[in-house]
């Protein structure tokens, strides 16, 4: 499934949880804010078919960093590299792992990922002390829900946020 964004007014007038006490505020709620950052980061991925982004906030909801899936920095792949998903997949660095390289254990409290973290990435996020993880697209092969439950990490799907409709992250082919 792809993420959807229906209209600008939908988040303003929605019953989505907010991080402030002003219910009449038009301020973007934290889940949608951090997911929008993750989505924007995903647009930097060089993978022409699958773009994944991640963003981290500290305990005060300040941005720690953003990251995306991609190849080792400086590596220039030939066009034929992208032809086979199976072949290229083993070389791709996941957005969550790239993100974890930007902060120390316990520094990030909230992480948003455009796709539910795979099992290994979920383990890494838990090991880094992340307490809340937002994601848009589910990933059926991941054990993330079980890992989150075991470690007391909130794993919450967020599909209604700016950018999701206008800039798709999964392209056909």
Model-predicted segments: where are they?
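Zinc-dependent deaminase catalytic domain
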Residues: 3-173
